[in-house]
Amino acid sequence: MISNAAISKVLRQIAYLIELEETKDNHEDNKNKVNTVFKIRAYRRTADVIENLSSNVEKIYNKWKLKGLTEIPSVGKAIALKIEEYITTGNIEYFGELKKRTPINVEEFYHLEGIGIGPRSVKALHDRLRIKNLAELEKAAAEGKIHSVPGFSYKKEESILRKIQSLKKDRGRYLLGDIYPLVKQIEVCLSNIKDVKKAIAVGSFRRMKETVGDIDYLVLSDAPEIVMDYFASMPEVDEVIGKGPSKTFVKLNNGMDADLLVVPKESFGSALQYFTGSKEHGVALRKIAISKGLHLNEWGIYDSNNNKMVAGSKEEDVYNILGLEWIPPEMRENNGEIELAKKERTGDGNKLKLPDLIDYNSLKGDLQVHSNDTDGMLSIQDIASAAKEKFELEYIAITDHTKSLALAHGLDEGRLLDQVNKISELNDILKNHFKYNNNNNKNKKDSSSSNSFRILSGAEVNILKDGSLDISNNVLDKLDVVGAAIHSNFSQPVEVQTNRLIKAAQNPNVDIIFHPTGRIINKREGYPVNIEKLINDAKDTGTVLEVDAHYNRLDLKDEYIRMAVQNGVKLVIDSDAHHSMHFAFLVFGIGQARRGWAKQSNILNTFSVEKMLNSLK
């Protein structure tokens, strides 16, 4: 079965190739240029939608054919036909024709867009230096040839080298959000086998790392042969690499390697700990075991004197016999969690404690949501309805982009105030709707304020080059929630960039700094920021820092979250939703917050709407 990520990737490459061709044809008339721009946007928008779609596109096609594809948001008939062709044949003729017309390896180059190397830049490099692939680009950059091309600087040359090294390092690793639905789907299918008692995806996936190399499934069953046969024949499996009595290796349809191991009941807990990792965490546990006269491996904990198993069936028992509290998987990186988990008291008589991490079901609201007033895909009413009905949130803030972000059709002061009035009217409609429902609810005990829902007015205000904002303070003062973010001038020095953020944070109307470092995982490193200085200023000014839960951002990084928590800086976890399906990304933000040791009390949008608003500046 073809993954959504594979379809999205092809559509992005088609858009890239169209733009590459457009840069060659300087004689194209204005009408055709406009059509080409819209065509490029259509392919990219469709790629975004499909990449974030919770349902598998091939399954939609198998059930509803072309009609099902055209009912996916933003998918027009022309692109739907291309998707149909890809699903049914594995190829797109138009894509092949585009590739034949250029010597440039688009599959390699389109990863560089995050550092500002788009089709126009790639064409310039090819025209001047005949560069056709990443290997040739790396060689030219290492030899100092890139900065000789008009439009390229020494700084850009260095940036290219860093990006290529990063791509090499991350080669074969997948974004957590790209593979999460597939991994969970397989996990559920395995769990539903009659002879399976437990099935868990372990490794870095269980630890909610932002990228994952491969997938390991651990299964508790007394019928390993049945499990092996089932796993090897799943439609999600592309190729069986190896199959034994209790372990099978496969390649999934998305190109990812996956292993499945069946273990007996007496060893399941020990295997769960061992294969969850991290490697460093496991090494530290084995050292503790040795110090206690024990031997720890994936099959259990044994007394070193007589080799008798003393624990292994439950993961909690493995930790307990080592004198430790059970440690949440997200914390298992050997960064101090083991010291906190020790049951004995410290020298001063105090007992260190593991933090009570934020729960995966604890978010009550989402404070970065976009509507089709700018670059979102749904109306305010539609995305609010989905937030309540499908994701059971109690409030959202509509934080559309503002005027200096022309690409997103950002709001000026007038349109922003119009939106505030629209939100007020929608809240009145919602209030009457819930009042009516409560009056008609036979079970009065269930007709509490939990049925209410509130839309907050807000904005994602653009931080300009000098740190000022692109919306006046007298308008910002009328909003419920103000987030500020950098969307341009990424290459300024670290001192300038940090001061830019700090100046925005010091504005009394700015409640939250959105995606504080601006990174796009595997695409853009983000702008340089003195994060320690920003965190200290956030503490002094009472400014909240955001954990952007979109899986290609996860900004803040986990180590920065931990730093913020240690300094008493409040955080929010937001989906950065541009469509209702994006609320599903909140799970990745929570996972990231847990990796940063955040408690529920550290995250403001675990609070009720009134308590959250009162906790802002």
Question: Model features per residue range: what roles?
Answer:
Residues 199-201, 365-369, 460:
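Two-metal-ion RNase H-like nuclease active-site motif
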Residues 5-8, 15, 23, 37-247, ...:
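Accessory alpha-helical DNA-binding modules that contact the DNA backbone or grooves
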Residues 33-50, 118, 446-472, 479-483:
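Extended, compositionally biased low-complexity polar/Lys-Gly-rich tracts
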Residues 176, 372-373:
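Short acidic-aromatic active-site loops that bind/stabilize oxyanions
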Residues 22-32:
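Charged, low-complexity interaction regions
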Residues 377:
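Positively charged, glycine-rich low-complexity segments
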Residues 208-292, 298-371, 380-394, 403, ...:
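Charged catalytic cores and adjacent phosphate/nucleic-acid-binding surfaces used
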